[in-house]
Amino acid sequence: MDQSQRTVAATPSSSRSYQFHPARAAIIDLFNLYLGRGSRQKPDESLRDPPNKSQKRVHAPNRDLPPRNEQFLLDFELLQSQFNDPEQLRTITESVLISLVVQCSNHAPRAEFLLFALRTLCRISYINWDTFLPSLLSSVSAAEASLSQGVQAAAATAGSSATSSQSVVPVSVNPTSLLPSAHGIGSPSASEVKSVENGQQIARAGQIVRENAMRNSQRIRAAAVNSLRQLSCKIILIGVESSLKPVTHAEIFQYMMNWLVNWDRRDLGTEDSVGKSWRSEKTLAEWLRSCLDVIWLLVEEGESRIPFYELLRSGLQFIENIPDDEALFTLIMEIHRRRDAMAMHMLMLDQHLHCPSFGTHRIVSQITANVPPEAVPHLRHSPITYPSVLGEPLYGEDLAMSIPKGSLDWERAVRCIRHAIRTTPSPDWWKRVLVVAPCYRPSTQAGPIPGAVFTSDMICEAIIDRIVELLKLTNSGNDCFGIDLVSVTFPPLYADANCWQEWLVFSDIFFFLIKSGCTDFVDFIDKLVLRLNGVDNHILRTNHVTWLLAQIIRVELVMTALNSDAKKVETTRKILSFHREDRNSDPNNPQSVLLDFVSSCQNLRIWSLSTTTRAYLNNEQLLKGKQIDEWWRSKGERMMDYMNMDDRSIGMFWVVSYTMAQPACETVINWLSSAGMAELPGLQPNDRVMMTQEVTPLPMSLLSGFSMNLCLKLALQMEEALFVSQVVPSIAMVETYTRLLLISPHSMFRSHFSQLAQRNASLLSKPGVTLLVLEILNYRLLPLYRYQGKSKTLMYDVTKIISALKGKRGDHRIFRLAENLCMNLILSLRDFFSVKREGKGPTEFTETLNRITIMTLAITIKTRGIADPDHMVYLQTMLEQILATSQHTWSEKTMRHFPSLLRETLKGRVDKRGLSIQAWQQAETTVINQCTQLLSPSAEPAYVSTYLSHSFPQHRQYLCAGACLLMQGHAENINSTNLARVLREVSPEEVTANIYTLVDVLLHHVHVDLQQGQSLEAVLDKAGANLAFFFWTHEMLPLDIFLLALIDRDDDPHALIIAMSLLKTPDLLLRIKNYCQNRGSPEHWLVTQVFKRNELQKALGNHLSWKDRYPTFFDDIAARLLPVIPLVLYRLIENNAMEQADNLLLAHSHFLAYHPLRFTFVRDILAYFYGHLPGKLVLRMLKVLDLSKIPFSESFPQYISPTGAPVCPPLDYFASLLLNLVNNVIPPLSSSSNCSSRSGSMADILNSSARPPHGKTPGTSQPGPANASEGQKAFYQIQDPGTYTQLVLETAVIEILSLPVSAAQIVSSLVQIIVNIQSTLIQSGNGFHGAANGVGQGSVLPTSPSGGSTDSMSASRSTCLIPGINTASFVSRSGYTCQQLSCLLIQACGLLLAQLPPDFHVQLYLEAARVTRETWWLKDGKRSQGELDSAVGYALMDPTWAAQDNTSTAIGNIVALLHAFFSNLPQEWLDGTNAIITNLRPVTSVAMLRVVFRIMGPLLPRLASTHTLFNKTLMLLLSALVDVFGKTAQTTAPVEASQIADLIDFLHHIIHYEGQGGAVQTSSKPRPDILALIGRAAETLRPDVQHLLAHLKTNPNSSIYAAAHQQNTAKTNTS
């Protein structure tokens, strides 16, 4: 043996007990005899042999030649007969063989004999390969580790020897020499120089020796590893020919892959230049090729010992240093080819265009996390994901940071952020996606953020893009998008053409982003300077950037950068460089004044920050600050009348807000209290309360220009006056405070309950503070909280108040206001929510709130679906929590419209109404006796206390019912004073119980009276008189709760009649009229008059105002009905009372204008009852909206006209609707502004040809000023739905839902546009001729040779244009090229369809199947399989890429539409997607099969978190596979199974993805039930296809995955 073998110790046996077994010595002797080794030679004996070959020849002992190999079997059988335990002998033999393989691998003759011996023993079935091969590979790994340690030791020895030789270099200084030195003082002698040179030479020699030793060690190890691995591979090739278990195959595969992936790993710690020397040697190729032979044998399709998919997920293709080996390169290329083919099925068409549109307020994350709903508000949100090479959606900050700038993924991420900055989605969205810039993170948070998908660099780039975009708009010389934005917000006198509103909206979010620390401020300034001095050096002409930076100059991070950062001087100089002299034609315009002085404000602030930067300030601007002081002394210090300020004064006051925020704040507060104070009237002297007199609140036009610093100071001081001061604030103060919060929703928002609790925990214990907070929230800030995503949190806070008060006697006002607010909050939620913050136990809601929660769930599920799979799991628990404290049963008419998820749960509940009446009848006698004593006209007032202290609660709940019976329509029959006192002094919970029992008893006695022969009119008149006593005469009960209780008994034929009569009562109508007059405009933020405070008793009635003296601000009995009327409308429609519903809307349409969320309310009713509403009622509902402010299509009214027969609008109408979404909802393709040409990487990819110079102007459904886009509106202008993007999308939804034609007609029109849009747009220059002869015929196959299409195929193709579309204006109104526009219209259509109810989805699936089936080349039986495969490959190309060559196809467009649709669907609605496969079956060709997989494949990763739906979809895909490759399949031409290898790989991959619940890892395994499902389906497949799925079964004897499950189960049981 050579040196390498002598360094290897003998491998220990698998069991130490066999080491001393007598058979072991005999077996070793036998093998040593045939190996030509000395008898019983110890494994390490060879270490003493000298390495010199000549010495070995001289000293070699005389040995006999070994016996012939043919004799071995006889000798072995003879030895075998000497021992009784054959199994033990086999184990020992295997152990010895493994040891000999390790020792003799570098000795070719001995290695050959070992191979011979193994073959011989294999022929007699003596080797158990399933134990032998894993043990062999384990021993090889141990031997390689030992080799590495030995080589490291040798290298260390060589290094130490070289060091020692260097340390003993002699230096001859010869101190005893008598000869004088020949050199001057300090000069070395010749001998010294020579000795130093000798020392350096010796050191270099030592280094060379060390390097040579290292190289020799490397070569020795390489040779040893090569021989050992090569011999092992040869043995494995022998073993694999036997029938091995799947576990053995898997283990062999893992070892082989580990060897290949780590082929160049160096364990010696040497430098790379030293370690490379052995890689290119012949030894590498030998073992590597043997290893490849094993792998090819394992993945051989004929045997399929290991599925080829294991190679795809092995990571072999990612090795950094691919050796120069053709065989390995061939394998890697094959892996890449099959991986790409498989990954395609994971990716949606045009996936790089899929990006959140923010068209809904729902946050839909692209990742799923198994968390309870109560934890959702704290989750990180991943709005996009990055596809891996295997097509899996990935996320994480470490991944995002690896995205190269300028790549498609980078552009997609920045596109998303740009669109968010433009459309200002919920701050809650921003908080969940932002990452703190690394420079601002504490050391404890140094690691990457797992759920993040954006980096600070991406956010910085998007911010700068938006600044550049706004600068270009400002410089355009015309107002934004062709209309005057400012006039929308301000009076005409403040209008300018510089897109001031756009800047205001952006400054709010800019402040929010900078304060969040999501981008490095110093780096941001550097990049902004480079951008404005580089490509865009001509656009900075105004002081808008200086103004923008002045807004944030007091942010802590900014002050740190300007005061203590190392680059503070440079940063300051760059900030000052943005100053430009103002050249506005109107110097008195408020914005012009501000921009003219803002540089001075900035210089003054920087001067006060740091002395080191003062030298760089502009003295002229500093001196200009004196003008500000002079103006302030002359005008500002005295009381200012903010309602009569001229333009210049407004501008100067804005300037003052930047330089003297505190004085400016004080003047505003002084103005709001300038009318003085007065005593609250009607109080006793000892109850004296002071109240601030009313003035006009500050107008929005003035507030909008305040600096953010002043706004924050004002908010704090106002909160002090509102919630801490003992003086009752004025309505003007409250209104101004809410306007501050509405004008800057990102920067100014605060959660009121949390903030007040932090400021002073005792504040909320004061009734006045609690009432004021509840009123502000209920009547002013409800939409703001929804926009912020804080409605659920607020609901939990309010629920705490309700829970604490519902059993407390007397606190009715706070309780009913809190209940009404909670009612509004629940009805405003359009996403799933947990009914308890903790998530466990029954709800703390009242019975009323429980019922409203069920209704809200029904509306949400039916109109928007459940977005998250975890919410679907939690739904049942939530229902149990609600129903645990609610006894209500919903009528059949109501549940008929409920979604099936709710209906199945609720339909089994027992109706306890009969039991309720029985309980009343049992208690009736006692109740009437008590009521007679309490309520007789002559009853003593003192009896009230006796009644309250001695009556039982089960009897008190019938008090109002008993009073009603005693009254008999005559109010004088009862003592109203005593009744009112009892109802005030019992708890709110008991009043609610009285209301519900009153409804039941009232309806019961209506039936009794009718049975006794009384007329219906007389009975209802009596009931009306009784109710008038409670609600109008004495105001004893809350009307809103009674109405809700009444309509919930809608299965009683008289309940809705009584409810409608109450809503039409003159008393109520008068109250509503007075409320509207006192309230003024529904847009309260525009009111510039002095608010009039309503008297407490007039506003709330006797019951709620009782002993309370704290005045109201906005609260009113009429306002409490706003959430109730829509629910009454629901009940009327459910009961088919359409005429009454129309009358209700007619009577209260003006009042409903005050509904805080009326746009959402109209949209949801149209969606909830789609298909059941008559056209007249639809029109009435639309009139509830402020039509002048809704961007409806100009032609929309003519298609919903009640006159004439319903007509489906032309295609031009639908195309324009989609164009409007492209222009206002779909994220733009580049960072360039709406007024400039499109550019950027993604846009370039969409179209490489030259684009026209015209810019993207906001599309309108029809030309005309009435529909012109109004640009970016402030939040307060569109509080419902919240953003302009949402408004445009939801308006399109309302239009579609209002059309008087079927869903099938609408979907057919949309699909017809989409499948032919590209050919229509491109060929529009040639005119339009003819009509569409079927949607599927309009596609064109590519004619390129690589497309595989032939002349005969192209000869019969036809193009189909869409008739009726004015494409000339269509394209010009978009600002995109034809190719770009066609792709974006597909995205817009998918988004729109995903917002519509499931009725439309069913039609879409039918249309998609029809288009696919009608494709002529899929039906052409004359085409070869190769032609069809090529055709389907090109047909399923991304429309983005197909658009470049004008090769868009019907199938490609329809699949892209489905994928855009899928990406916007909530999780629950994905359940219906399986209808596509059902509609396409039976699948009759491989081409059609590929279409099916291409449609549904990308959906499966989203379904991985919904196991049941995943199984269902997978089963249908397998059924389609059986259609083509089943044993009884009737296909036109036989197809080999190898042609669907990519589909087989995809099936392997997706079940691993589902088993892992995410990206596939090395430990990922499929679920056993999935294996069982595929196994059952495989039984019906052809044998050759079955063979490809052999491992996707539950049989551990044939499946490596089933065997792995069995192993894990065994380990678990053992442990």
UniProtKB/Swiss-Prot annotation:
Question: What job does this protein perform?
Answer: Component of the Mediator complex, a coactivator involved in the regulated transcription of nearly all RNA polymerase II-dependent genes. Mediator functions as a bridge to convey information from gene-specific regulatory proteins to the basal RNA polymerase II transcription machinery. The Mediator complex, having a compact conformation in its free form, is recruited to promoters by direct interactions with regulatory proteins and serves for the assembly of a functional preinitiation complex with RNA polymerase II and the general transcription factors.
Give me the stretches of Basic and acidic residues compositional bias: 41-51
The UniProt record lists the keyword Membrane: no
Its annotated compartments are: Nucleus
Q: Which domain of life is it from?
A: Eukaryota
* Quaternary state and interactors: Component of the Mediator complex.
Q: Which family, according to the similarity comment?
A: Belongs to the Mediator complex subunit 23 family.
**Any one GO CC term of the record:** mediator complex
What name appears for this protein in its UniProt entry? Mediator of RNA polymerase II transcription subunit 23
Instruction: Give the start-end ranges of region Disordered.
Output: 40-67, 1230-1270
Instruction: From the UniProt record, list the coiled-coil ranges.
Output: none
What residue spans carry the Low complexity bias annotation?
Answer: 1230-1241
Q: Per its UniProt record, what InterPro entries does this chain match?
A: Mediator_Med23
